[in-house]
């Protein structure tokens, strides 16, 4: 849906024709992940409501424009009756967009390395139990590429505090222990390094069944897609932006995993990743996938272009 909405939440040339017809939006949870969704919520021609059966600690009346609704009856009254064919049109657009994304991911992987978006798509698609998502770029990659799982008991967890990076390794271990099921954690390298101490399991503690899939692009990728990326293009600014925002680290993740007694595997292609995540092993593993930060904007642009190419000349929007 973020790709269907376009950059301006449905009010730009990149948006699917359906997006401009949106009249009401119901918000579930805090919308901090996607700028396109925030742009949609800010559209003056769109009425918005927040479904809040219990008080939301982040929502202060008067500071956001959504109207709080508590009951399903209030929600139904706000939503009203959709036009015939409206839901089917969105479902059709979504299926076409999903197919376009998956086809584009296959064609955009660069030789002997996977793109970060492909790692996110494959890892999430393999979920048969709990999935823990790291913050920053990783969770946004899943947001763009994930096909909802067929497993009815799939669960997704994420730390969404100030930045969400704190304690993610320990969160994943806690989820695995609490749920009693093999858990997959998809993390960026900085998220993994920020709490490397979470890999420590004392001799009297229970080891979780946990796969840590680490997208290692040697630094922080999120800033290149924000305003900082434009700053880097100015004369003399590329090096300081890379040092202060890219923060390359050069850490040997295999050596780090060995120090904590965690088996390490380097994954180089899609087949290896699928095979590794299908292997019913016990205990913990660190699956390292080395990526290039330069691939991220290239692949993101290719995904957006692929979805735009699926827009029919005339969209089947109900009159």
Located regions from the model:
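Active-site diphosphate/adenylate-binding microenvironment
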Residues: 91-179
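Flexible, charged surface loops at secondary-structure boundaries
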Residues: 17-23, 41-43, 123-128, 150, ...
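Terminal amphipathic helices with adjacent charged low-complexity linkers/tails
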Residues: 48-88
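Glycine-rich, anion-gripping cofactor-binding loops and their flanking helix/strand elements
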Residues: 1-60, 148-181, 193-200, 245, ...
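Glycine-rich, charge-decorated loop segments at or immediately adjacent to ligand/cofactor-binding or catalytic sites
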Residues: 1-4, 56-68, 221-231
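Generic structural signal for well-ordered, non-membrane alpha-helical segments
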Residues: 15, 19, 30-34, 83, ...
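Thiamine diphosphate
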Residues: 141, 146-319
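Structural motif
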Residues: 26-31, 51-54, 133-137, 187-188, ...
